[in-house]
Amino acid sequence: MNPPAKTPWDEVGLTAGEYRLIVDILGRPPNHVELGMFGLMWSEHCSYKTSKRYLALLPQTGKRIVIGPGENAGVADLGDGFVVVWKIESHNHPSAIEPYQGAATGVGGILRDIFTMGARPIACLDSLRFGPLDDPRVRYLVGGVVAGIAGYGNTTGIPTVGGEIVFDECYRDNCLVNAMCVGLLVGDRIIRGRAEGPGNPVLLVGNRTGRDGIHGASLLASREFDEKAEEMRPAVQVADPFVEKLLIEACLELSGWDGLVGINDLGAAGLTSAASEMASRAGTGLDLDISRAPRREAGLNPYEVMLSESQERMLVVVKKGREGEALDLFAKWGLVAAVIGQVTDDGMLRIRDRADNPTDGAPGELARDASAVGVTGAATALRIVAEIPARALAHDAPAYDRPMAEPAYLAEVRKLDLDRLPDVRATGAIRLGTADPAVGPPAAAMLRRLLASPNLASKEWVWRQYDHMVRTNTVVLPGSDAAVLRLKREEPAESKASTAGAVDSVDSVGAVGAGRTAEAPTRGIALSTDGNGRYAYLDPFLGGAQAVAEAARNVVCAGAEPVGLTNCLNFANPEDPGVMWQFRRCVEGLAEACRVLETPVTGGNVSFYNETMGRAIFPTPVVGMLGLVEDIDRRMTAGFKRTGDAILLAGETRQELGGTEYLKLVTGEVRGCPPALDLTREKALQAFVLEAIRAGLVRSAHDCAEGGLAVALVECAFLGESGARGLEADVSAGAVPKPPGIRLDALLFGETQSRVILSCDPACEPALFDLARGRSVPLSRLGAVSDEVFVLRSGSAVVLREPTSELARLWREALPKALESRLAGTRFVRGDSTMTTVKGDDQ
C-alpha cells in the first residue's frame, strides 16, 4: 500500500487545524512562501506552543535581573558597573545528523544572541550527552561535536571554560548538544531586537544567503527521527567562524553608534524569524525587498530566501538617512551588507521579490505588482510574494494543552531491593578466593571501576581541545566545580550612544552600570552547567530541582553568590502523554528550586522530539548558572592545598543508591528513587559554605555529587597541589544512621544531595563549627590531607588504601583510551565532519 500523499501543511510541519487558523488570520489561503514562513514560526522549536504555558511557572525576576525571558538573552547587573548577558540553547538534532557543523553552528548561534545585545562574548560552556562509547557511531559523534565546538570557539577567540559530558544508552540515537555563552556589556547600553520608527531603513549584514538550513526549525528540530533522518543533512547549517569574528567586532562597534535603532540575529527560521520578531516586539511592520539580499548562489527563489538558515547574518535597523554610515562601518570590517527594506506602521511583514524570479511554481502566489518601498535604486518590476501580520508569525502561534499521564514505567523502575545487591567490602574483610555470591567486590576495585567509567573519568581530553585561556580572564580552569573569570572593563570602539529608538540606556532601567569605583575589589563570575537525566527519568520533579541545586552549589563552591540561571529542557516527543507529564513535573521542580534558592530564570530553550523510532532520551533538564564572585582573590577551587589540613564534610550521608552511577555500573540498570533533596537544607548549606569562603576559613571546597563521597574525595586529591595529594578519612563521619545501619557502598558511592567537602587549616576548625551550628548545617571532621596515599576508613576498619598517583593515572587515561584508540586516523575539519584516515606525519 502506498503511503498517503502529503498535504501542503504536512510538508512544512503544520497540522490541518493550524492551516485552517492561518486561513482565518489571512482571510485567504496562504501561498507557498507564506505557508513555509508559518511552518517555521509555528514550529515547536520557534513558537514554544506546547511548553510556554508551563514555562510561565518559572520565577523570572530577582534583585540583580535587568532583563528576563523575551529578549535574545537574559541580563544581570552585578554592580560596580558590570552588566552580564547570558543564555543557553540546544543544537541537538543538527548535531546528531552532522556533528561538526551541528555543534559549530550551535556555538555560533549562541554567540550571536549575546553580542546582538551589545555584549562582548567572554566565555562559552557546553553540556553534552552521548550514547555508550562502544558504538562506533557514538565515537564519531563525540569526535565531531568536540571538534566543532573547538573549531568555532577557538577561531572566534572565545574561551570554552567548562561544561559537562555524560554517556548513557538513552542518548545513543539522539545526542544532546547544549551551548551556553556569557557576555559582558560594552559601554552602557543594552541593544534591543526591535524595529522601531516607521521609515527607518533595514539592513541585512554578514554572510550571503544560501540554501543551507532550509526547514531546520520546522522539520529537523520539531520532529522525532526516523529511518530517513540522514536525508535531513541539507537542513543542517554551515558554519563560518571567520565571518562571525568580523560580525562580533562590527556589531560591538555599532552598539556605540547613535544611528542604531535595533538589531537581531538570523538564527532558527532565518530572515522570517528576525524580521517578524523585530516588528512584532515594536508593534510595527517591515517591507522587505529580498531581491537585494546578498546571495551565495544564483537561482534562489523567495521560499528559499525566507526559509534559509545560513549562518552569521544579522538584521539591523538604523535611523533614516544614516544607512550610508552603517554600510561604511560594515565595509570597514569586510562584511557584505545591503539595505533591503524599511520599517512601516501597519504591522505587516511584506516580502517583495523581482517579478521575473520564479517562486518554484507553487500555486496561490500573490500576483500583484508592487514597487519597492524605501530602497534606494530598487528595481520597479517587483511583486509581493508574502504579506502576513508580523505578530501572527512571531507571537500568535496556537498554544496547546496536550494530554498527559504519569508514565507506566515509573512504578517498576522505582523498585530497588538492596537486600539483593551485595555490598562492597573493606580491604581484607574476607579471605581472597571466597566464592560466596552474597559477598560484593572489594571497595578499592569498585572505586577503580568508577574512576574509569566515562561519566566520572577526567574530561581533560575534551577541554584540552578548547582554548580556555584566550583573553586571559580565566582564573579557575575547567575541571573544578565551576569556571571562574575575572571581570574587566569592556569599552565600545566608538561612544556616540543615545537612548533613542529601541536602544535602552542601561542606566535608564534601574541605574544599571552605575557606581564604578576604582577602589573596589576585582570582581569575577562563576559559571556552571548541570543536569542529571537519570534522576529526572526516575522522578522528573526531583530531577528538575536537583539540576538547579547542584548548579547553584557548584558556583558557591567557587566562592560565588548564585545570581540567576538559564536553562535548556531536553525531552522526547510531546505528543506522548507520558513525556508531557515528565515535562510539567520537571518544570515544577525547577520552579520550586528557583524560588527557594532565589535563582530566577532569565531564558533558555526547550528541545522536544529527541526520540528515534520510539526510543526516547531521558528527560534532561540542563541549568546554566551564573554566580558573582565579589572578590576574585577569594575564589575557591576543589583541590587540597596543604598537608595536614583538616578535611570536613558539610551535610549528611544517607543510604541513597537509587539512580547512582554506582548502581548503573554494578547492575546495568537505572532504577530506585533518586537521592532526596531538602531545599531548605540546601539553601542553609550554600549560605554556610559561601560565608566560610568569604571569611577566609577554608582552603578548598568541592561539591559531593556523581560517584559519591569516595569519588569526590579522590577528586580533591587529584586536583590538589604538589605534596597534598593524599588523605586519610573516615567516610562514616556524618552518616545518618551510623554504621552498621548504613551500607558501606552507600557511604562510599551513594549520591546524597546537599554535601560539600571542605579543607581548612586546623586552627580554623572551631570557627567553622561555630558557623555551621549558627546555620543549622551538619558538619563532621573526616580526616586530614596527607602526601601521596589515599586511605579511607569506616570507623576503625580500613576500607581501602591506594597510591593516589595510580588512581589519578587511571582517572586521567580512561576517556582518551576509550576514544583516541578508536578515533585514530579521524580528522574533523571545518566544513566537513566526514571521518578521513591520515597516516604518519599527517596525524
Model-identified regions with their sequence ranges:
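Compositionally biased, intrinsically disordered low-complexity segments enriched
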Residues: 498-516
